């Protein structure tokens, strides 16, 4: 039995490196002060293969900011030489990405089956959606809202006590494949809803008076790919005629200033906006569902990582939303509540000025559909681990995020429209 468990451990650990192994890859953080520094990074990106972690692309780099990016092992010396010769201040956040990837799995022996305190692959999450619905029929129902490019079923969980004409909160996770903490939170939220209903006054009130539409993984194809082939994959896995490059950035594919700023029309770019708004089956499924339930959905919450931010519209424009003061006040209260548990500090504000301009985002689109409480959460951390947050941080991350989500939900309930 012990030999079997060890085999399972080794198999799981190696599965994430069956394609890209990331041995010797480094993640750098560069301190950008001015336009000259930005030009130098553009020059570097044109000669070396750089995987931008924050922001998503070199085109989104702003003065007086920090830039995190991954470099393949064979390019690390050249990149460090370039940064040093040009006076760009930097530090190495991750000196060997493979070691960090293996360390994200805290338990040496991986249990089979679903766990809320570990990262689960799609097969496990899919089975969990069926099980959690069948075990809690008075609180949860599961429905299919579409299929992905590769034919995987997109499952949605409706969480709430049965009732007619109930207002709703829509929450999705897993837009970007490598942001594993995001689907972990959606699963945690469902667990907490079931566990605390009838025991905790706020959750009981929420589920009596509201429905939560929870989409645990939007980009299923990409998420699967991060488990089997390339842990750092971001986009979907769709293909298109005339290009050898794969995938679209789902969070550039919505009809909100589509492909106008902070997005690329190059299929090989990490921020490729797609051939048209809602060209991807996944974004179309989300948009269709929301359009069909627009009269009931009062808040839209989309969960990403990393950088510890709570963002609201707009990202495709520097204009402020009509209820900017209200959204700012709500975000301020939510991040204060979040920080009260573990002291985790979040920045908050409109997307374009707080993080970077980006068009085609789901939060902007939802807001423009009339959903006035629309927020993006960028979960832990601020770059020490980035996209490879250890499993030991799942519980504290989810616990504190729950406080913010519940704060927003309480406000929405008190300000129905």
Curated annotation (Swiss-Prot):
Under Enzyme Commission nomenclature, its number is 3.4.17.2
Keyword entries, A-Z: Carboxypeptidase, Cytoplasmic vesicle, Disulfide bond, Hydrolase, Metal-binding, Metalloprotease, Protease, Secreted, Signal, Zinc, Zymogen
Q: Which gene encodes it?
A: CPB1
Q: What GO cellular component entries does it have? A: cytoplasmic vesicle; extracellular space
Q: Give residues annotated as binding substrate.
A: 176-179, 234, 251-252, 305-306, 356
Q: Which family does it belong to?
A: Belongs to the peptidase M14 family.
According to UniProt, the name of this protein is Carboxypeptidase B
The biological process GO terms on file are: proteolysis
Cofactor stoichiometry and binding?
A: Binds 1 zinc ion per subunit.
Peptidase M14 domain location, by residue?
Answer: 118-412
Cellular compartment(s): Secreted; Zymogen granule lumen
Q: Name one Pfam family in it.
A: Propep_M14
**Matches recorded under PANTHER family:** CARBOXYPEPTIDASE B (PTHR11705:SF20), PROTEASE FAMILY M14 CARBOXYPEPTIDASE A,B (PTHR11705)
User: Matching SMART domains, A to Z?
Assistant: Zn_pept
Q: List the disulfide bonds.
A: 173-186, 245-268, 259-273
Could you say which residues form the signal peptide? 1-16
Q: Which SUPFAM superfamilies match?
A: Protease propeptides/inhibitors, Zn-dependent exopeptidases
Q: What else is known?
A: Chemical modification of Tyr-356 leads to loss of enzyme activity. Chemical modification of Glu-378 leads to loss of enzyme activity.
- Primary residence: secreted
Residue span(s) of the pro-peptide: 17-110
Q: Name one GO molecular function term.
A: metallocarboxypeptidase activity
Q: Which reaction does it catalyse?
A: Preferential release of a C-terminal lysine or arginine amino acid
Cofactors, names only: Zn(2+)
The record, for CDD domains, names: M14_CPB
Active-site residues, Swiss-Prot/TrEMBL = 378 (proton donor/acceptor)
Identify the residues that bind Zn(2+): 176, 179, 304
Q: Which organism is it from?
A: Bos taurus
